[in-house]
Amino acid sequence: MSIRLDNISKHFGQFQALAPLSLKIEDGEMIGLLGPSGSGKTTLLRIIAGLEGADSGTIHFRNRDVTNVHVRDRRVGFVFQNYALFRHMTVADNVAFGLQVMERAQRPNPAEIQKRVKQLLEIVQLGHLAHRYPEQLSGGQKQRIALARALATQPEVLLLDEPFGALDAKVRKELRRWLRSLHDELGFTSVFVTHDQDEALELSDRVVVMSNGRIEQIDSPVELYAQPNSRFVFDFFGNVNQFAGEWQNGQWVNGSAFIQPPESDATRQSGLLYVRSHELALSDKENSQASLPFEVVSINPVGAEVRVELASVGWQSQELWEAKLSHRSLSEKRLSRGDQVFATPQVGYFFASEGQSSPSVLRWPFLAPGSLMFEI
């Protein structure tokens, strides 16, 4: 079922939780609401559910105006971060609860309820735990039961509030794959809240990035990563290095460091250059188009990559820089703490100091043959 929000706003006293915003969610789409604490994402989810009322605007489920419809009559399933399972009920009774409290005219008979519960427990792969109690389950199992309970009434929309926030990293990853597979199999419309960038990018058809009650960007995970449209989106996604450069004599200068940009009117001014850690090359010497001297601070193998932390030498950077290398490249030419290296951006995203809300994307093919210490 499609969802349309038009000019939704919300205040709590003097605090503006949501500025007027609009959003269209397609039938069968999985949407991630992503943002830091206080961005308004949970408030927006609760307004869609009917757990909060909007101060202004309208909400449509398909062609039905549900702005003033009670949560009970919206046909939504809601999954909470803390599971909200009834401790005194068995797994089967928890799943059946929503069906048992439906109005008499709509309530299935006991045999149908039992059949539906059995089907749902098989879907979430926990049929063998039907007679256990929540305290006997792991966190991942509790979350699956909470999801089965939300699906029991056959909602047209499934809403999830940080569904994996209380789980460890390995279980979170497994449940993300499982939920995406279940969503594709059953075809319901889903909206979930998260502050985890990886979770949003892995699960969502589109990601809605929020900040201070406003929508910063709506895009597919691929487009969002490839073309962030604001400084906030860059900063929030992390793993981004920043070079603050003053425009002098055809290049950006910061202390002893400089970068010469490709010819472009948009970049011939002071501003901030963002460089992702995997789009940064390390060299044993400077070149004519970039000189960013660093000292190696730490070398940290993390899974399939090696993360090298770098401290600026002779110029100012508010934070350490990071470069991501492959294990193969690091084994070919050793790198140690305290080594002096030069970094060169391969791709950069430039924001002018004034009047530019979206970045200019720049690419440099400048390293001379043989000057690379490591290839990313």
Curated annotation (Swiss-Prot):
Keywords: ATP-binding, Cell inner membrane, Cell membrane, Membrane, Nucleotide-binding, Sulfate transport, Translocase, Transport. The keyword Cell inner membrane applies. Its main location: membrane. Its EC number is 7.3.2.3. SUPFAM superfamilies: MOP-like (SSF50331), P-loop containing nucleoside triphosphate hydrolases (SSF52540). SMART domains: AAA. GO terms for molecular function: ABC-type sulfate transporter activity; ABC-type thiosulfate transporter activity; ATP binding; ATP hydrolysis activity. It holds the Pfam family ABC_tran. GO terms for biological process: sulfate transmembrane transport. ATP binds at residues 35-42. GO terms for cellular component: ATP-binding cassette (ABC) transporter complex. It is found in: Cell inner membrane. It catalyses: sulfate(out) + ATP + H2O = sulfate(in) + ADP + phosphate + H(+); thiosulfate(out) + ATP + H2O = thiosulfate(in) + ADP + phosphate + H(+). It comes from the Bacteria. Residues 3-237 form the ABC transporter domain. It is a peripheral membrane protein. PANTHER family: SPERMIDINE/PUTRESCINE IMPORT ATP-BINDING PROTEIN POTA, SPERMIDINE_PUTRESCINE IMPORT ATP-BINDING PROTEIN POTA. Belongs to the ABC transporter superfamily. Sulfate/tungstate importer (TC 3.A.1.6) family. Part of the ABC transporter complex CysAWTP involved in sulfate/thiosulfate import. Responsible for energy coupling to the transport system. The complex is composed of two ATP-binding proteins (CysA), two transmembrane proteins (CysT and CysW) and a solute-binding protein (CysP). This is Sulfate/thiosulfate import ATP-binding protein CysA. It comes from Vibrio cholerae serotype O1 (strain ATCC 39315 / El Tor Inaba N16961). The gene is cysA.
